[in-house]
A protein has these predicted regions:
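Substrate-binding groove of N-acetylhexosamine-processing glycoside hydrolases
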Residues: 1-194
């Protein structure tokens, strides 16, 4: 689909640029894995078509709930695709005090399904805002959410305790996962108790 756009553009002008997005605009967590999946083909086709000007957006829709620095993994990935191949693990550690793989853990509160890197979803947001007494018939709550969120909180806890100016990112995601380990299934538990 990207090549078709460039073919159309070339009929109109020789001067064009590319604007892509680092996904952080649908909830509290970034979507670095989805950004990587969606930007790889886009950047490859842009480079093949000789695009020189490239812009990366990180919109703050819905109150800019996800932290601006939570997309550092996306920025490093896109940098590597675009112009500089470097060891992402080491560079991320030098830059933030966290390895690249550790930074990708910021996505965890929205990763409840095996396919989440393919479709951006925001269960952490809708589960947090769900009224546990009224429920929401469009929200499907699974019993295993409690287990997922407990596991996520356990993974995020030591990362939140590291000495780094970016540790607040992990504290926020840990606290969100920890809270959701209780709240995500509370409506089911209340219903069953009733």
């Amino acid at each position: 689909p990207y090549q078709n756009k460039y073919d159309s553009l070339k009929q109109l002008t020789k001067s064009y640029a590319f604007a892509g997005g680092a996904w952080k605009w649908i909830g509290f967590t970034p979507h670095n894995l989805f950004t990587m999946r969606s930007m790889k083909p886009a950047i490859e086709v842009a480079i093949e078509n000789g695009v020189k000007d490239f812009l990366l957006t990180a919109w703050g829709d819905n109150g800019a709930e996800a932290a601006q620095f939570s997309i550092i993994p996306s920025l490093l990935y896109i940098r590597d695709l675009s112009y500089q191949k470097e060891d992402r693990q080491s560079f991320a550690a030098l830059l933030t005090g966290y390895t690249y793989d550790e930074l990708l853990k910021l996505d965890l509160p929205d990763l409840l399904y095996h396919h989440d890197a393919y479709t951006p979803t925001n269960p952490s947001k809708y589960l947090l805002f769900e009224d546990v007494l009224m429920g929401h018939r469009q929200i499907s709550v699974e019993k295993n959410y409690k287990t997922y969120y407990k596991q996520h909180a356990k993974i995020l806890k030591p990362l939140s305790e590291k000495t780094s100016k970016y540790s607040y990112l992990f504290r926020t995601m840990h606290d969100l996962a920890d809270l959701l380990s209780i709240k995500s299934t509370l409506s089911l538990e209340i219903y069953q108790a009733y």
